Structures are given as C-alpha cells and as structure tokens.
C-alpha cells in the first residue's frame, strides 16, 4: 500500500478558488472497479443551488455515501462530471476543493488531546469565541459546559470518554470551524436524540444560510 500512488492529481493550471457552493451532477456514473456492470451510481443528474439544503434517505448500499464522496473528489467519476460553482471538480486544486467541502461521517474520529485541540483540527487559527460558537450551533456547548475543565477537558484517543452523540456533535462543530461552502453530514447525527437533531438543523438554517448543506440520514425527521 505504501508504494501505491494516488490516481487523483491536479490538472495543469487548476482553479485556486471555489466560486460558490452550488453543485451540479451531469449524467454521473461511478464504479469502484473498472466494470460498468457493477456501477453503484448510474446516470445521475442533480442540481443543488448554493445555500440550499438537500436531504438524502436510502437503504444500506444504495449509493448515498458514494454520491457525496464525489463532491470533494475522494474519487473521480467513471462517466459524466461533478461541478462546484460551475467548475468541474477535476479542474479545481484538490487542496482548495477539500478546504471548501466539510464532511462529517457517522463514525468520525477524535484524537487524544483537549476539546479545543480537537476542534482546531478544523481550523488551527480558530479563536476561543469561534470554537464556542461552533459548539453552540452543533449543540455541543451545553454538555461541554458540564465538564469541570470545560473546553480544556482531555479527550482520550478515539473519544472513548465521551458518548457517541457527544462525539458526533464535536465532530460537527469541528467541520463548522472550517467555514466551508459545502457541509455534508453522512448519517452523522445517528447517535443524537431527535430533539437535539432538530436544534442542530434549526441552527444551520438560522446561522449558516449561505452554506450548502447535504444531510444523509436514516431517520426521516433528520432531513425535514
């Protein structure tokens, strides 16, 4: 594995900025292997205006995660194109692209260190005020305030000393600190109760209206 080279490369003279958070899928097909008979996505056409919210619900293995992983170019499409801000993602500098797209997965990772240190992986220049605000939006601040050391509380490797729902909310806050143009939540509130889930969605609507939000969920209430 260490000797393998990535198949994802910048084109010559890539774009160094993302114009906005609009997303367009043009006749997209995708397969993890070079076999058209085993495509997990086929002929997908999708237009997501900048600042809008899209909810995606589907069974396990239906291609939900594969779809959104094409947006930050974790994989390249087999056919068709994915555009952000009107530009094909293959024509945007990979670092620039991924800096403008934040993804929060169902099983995200916390590292050993304080809560502040973990959150600054999203933005190493984030101020204490920005950290608290991001946690307020993600509904993490209420439980952080109950810890004796609050934001200086030490998190064990893998976040083993916080609950699954607390871990997910901290990971959402970390993504918000990037101030991305596109925010993707891939079943990342699955361990959060429905009331808190609703508060997170309301905060997104009120506080980050210009951010394009894609929410993948198992619960219908999570995308309403």
Language-model-derived ranges and their functions:
Residues 3, 7, 11, 16-224:
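ABC-type nucleotide-binding domain
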């Amino acid at each position: 594995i260490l000797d393998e080279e990535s198949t994802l490369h910048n084109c010559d003279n890539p774009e160094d900025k993302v114009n906005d958070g609009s997303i367009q899928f043009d006749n997209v097909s995708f397969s993890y292997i070079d076999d058209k008979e085993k495509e997990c996505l086929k002929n997908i056409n999708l237009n997501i205006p900048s600042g809008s919210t899209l909810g995606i619900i589907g069974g396990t293995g239906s291609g939900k995660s594969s779809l959104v992983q094409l947006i930050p170019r974790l994989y390249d499409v087999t056919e068709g194109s994915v555009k952000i801000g009107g530009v094909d993602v293959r024509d945007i500098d990979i670092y620039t692209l991924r800096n403008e797209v934040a993804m929060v997965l169902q099983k995200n990772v916390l590292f050993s260190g304080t809560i502040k240190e973990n959150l600054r992986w999203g933005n190493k220049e984030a101020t204490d005020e920005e950290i608290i605000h991001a946690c307020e939006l993600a509904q993490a601040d209420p439980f952080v305030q109950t810890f004796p050391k609050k934001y200086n509380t030490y998190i064990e490797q893998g976040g083993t000393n916080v609950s699954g729902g607390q871990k997910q909310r901290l990971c959402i806050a970390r993504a918000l600190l990037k101030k991305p143009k596109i925010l993707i939540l891939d079943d990342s509130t699955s361990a959060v109760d429905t009331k808190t889930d609703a508060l997170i969605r309301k905060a997104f609507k009120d506080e980050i209206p210009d951010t394009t939000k894609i929410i993948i969920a198992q619960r219908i209430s999570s995308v309403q």
